[in-house]
Amino acid sequence: MGQPRFSRPVHPAAAAEEVDHPPSDAGMGVDVLESGDTTPPTKRKSKFSGFGKIFKPWKWRKKKSSDKFKETSEVLERKISMRKPREELVKRGVLLEDPEQALSSDCPGKEGSVLRKSIILISHFRDAETPGQSEDDGGRLLYLQFQNLLLREGKEAAWPWHQAECIPVEQQVPPLGIKLTRGLFPSAGKSQGRAAEHPGLGLTSCVLLSTSILSAPANVSAGAFLVSFLSLVCNCSEALRAPGGEAVTLLTDTXEVTNQAQPPCQTAPCPPHPIPTNRNSSSVIAELSQAINSGTGLSKPSPPLPPKRGLLPTNPPEAALPSKPPGDRTVTASRPTLLPMHVAPTYPPPSPSPPLPTHIPPEPPRMPLPNSTPALDAPRSLDLPKETPPPSKDFRSLEVSKRTAEQGFGEPPGLPRLPQIPLHIRIQQALASPLPVTPPADGSHRAHSLLFENDGFGEDNGTLGRTRSLPVTIEMLKVPDDEEEEEEDQEEEQNSGPRVYIGDVPSITVIPMLVPQVLPEEQEGEEGMSDSDSEGPILYKDDEEDEEEDESHNSTLANKVKRKDTLAIKLGNTTTVQEEKIVFPRKSKEEWNEIRQQIGTTLIRRLSQRPTAEELEQRNILQPKNEADRQAEKREIKRRLTRKLSQRPTVAELQARKILRFNEYVEVTDAQDYDRRADKPWTKLTPADKAAIRKELNEFKSCEMEVHEESKQFTRYHRP
């Protein structure tokens, strides 16, 4: 069973510590993994221990450790106890032989040249280990192939497998004439600590390759060195398997990329990239792809982050992108390019929403809305097609995106046309107008309508399709059946006094109408009465009475005016109405007899359904009529009772028959007859009354029942 090989940064202090302390797993504490010291630490009394007394239901209990946690800790402890000693690890090349020498960066004349010992950790998993193959055969094979690749390029390998001496800068320059800048691998050092080891997944071997990354003044692309190394990894990818059994392929078409002309890196040193937090076997690959972000388009980028809130993703035009050689263009057509860091990355928008335009059209000036005359603004919108006030920014951007998705950017968006307002809504707007209604100057009874009233639009704008002012005619409410009696009503209006015919002639009582006679238009015009001041009814008549006589115009304004005037007249005439006597119309004797007969038959029919007197007496509903009869009934009842009582045996007879037994000391005395009824019924007893009754019973049983001394233990007392 192959043991996992742990690789760590080549700092000597850290390496010395890691020999004694193994790496801890992601979810476990370090003290669990220590096999030597298993005693738990002493528990101190917490300063918040008093909270448990306050919050009684929620006690602070220690969580039980799960069985899975215990099993994994036991497995780890067993594996740690089977660790190889330090000398064997040094022989295999996992650890450096002399870690103190690795710290010395004071080479003659090259102070500060060594930046970092970069560790590239390539962990691979095998489905089944080949028998006869040692644990580090894969690592040796990988190193030998890398050494052969460097020799084929014409350079000797500048860094040995075990050595960490300070090598001169000329020998440490990587092959293919590459100068590595300082900011090339910013995340290499961080990734050393983040490489997650999974001991239970069959990790068989690791390759530890330490390379010295040096700072050099020349601006040469770093892609060729990585290509040469990664092509070596791709050659060995048949032996390298992922945990699921899939081959780890770092890059495809490596030979095609190596043939390209590498352009010099023209961008500034990149800032450190964020390190991916997922701890899987592809973390190193993601870091390698991030390291060559600035100059090359070799690897696939990680999925794009969502854009920050409030920023619009702007697609840079194609002309603004840096020009590439034709070899690069063939690669970028098949793979997405990695832009330099100073260029904002273009995030692909979600598929259902259309792309937002980069240029928002300027906002048209907002027109102030007059609040004083809402009734006058409504008809203006009918006459002239105005521009609607601009919507809010969010709504406008949504509308712009919708229009651009439908008709493109070239076509101007059409102005929305206002719908025609129906007539009844315009009438309601005119009636709800806060402006005072002024009568026309000609004195006619025509309702002054504000429907098509305008301030600045007169007859000049007649060509714009304006209609003339709509006359609203208001008449009194009229029932069609009353047209025949119109003449009689007019005569009755003239003689408004009540008329009663005395005698055998049937009398007709005329109740006066509450509406006085209407003045003609000419007389009202001479007297100068206004519509609001006139006490009579306001009868608005149109000039064309004959045509509109059949139609009754019952609008809300007519009902309002009619209600107001009739209420005022009624309130003024209340006293006269109360003083008038209600006179019933006289009828003949025959009619009265018929009415009486009808009432009698209905009463007889209803009375026949009533129970008789005998039935009511049997039900004890109807009492006997006379008081003497009641007294006689009482006497009869008393006589029956006395006869029954007289037939009772006497006390002597009962003693002789030994039914009654009297002791000698018992005295029979005559007691006064008293009322045995309680003060109140038992249903209305309060708790205090019940307590008093219980107390009285207990006192009686304890004091006055001395006769039953023998059975006193059986006496049942009531609770107090």
Curated annotation (Swiss-Prot):
Record's compositionally biased regions (Acidic residues): 481-494, 521-534, 542-551
A GO cellular component annotation in the UniProt record: cytoplasm
Compositionally biased intervals (Basic residues): 637-646
Keyword Disulfide bond: no
Residue ranges of RPEL repeats: 74-99, 601-626, 639-664
Compartments, record wording: Cytoplasm; Cell projection, Lamellipodium
PROSITE patterns reported in the protein's UniProt record: RPEL
GO molecular function: actin binding; protein phosphatase 1 binding; protein phosphatase activator activity
Function: Regulator of protein phosphatase 1 (PP1) required for neural tube and optic fissure closure, and enteric neural crest cell (ENCCs) migration during development. Acts as an activator of PP1. During neural tube closure, localizes to the ventral neural tube and activates PP1, leading to down-regulate cell proliferation within cranial neural tissue and the neural retina. Also acts as a regulator of migration of enteric neural crest cells (ENCCs) by activating PP1, leading to repression of the integrin signaling through the RHO/ROCK pathway.
Protein name in the entry: Phosphatase and actin regulator 4
Organism: Gallus gallus (Chicken)
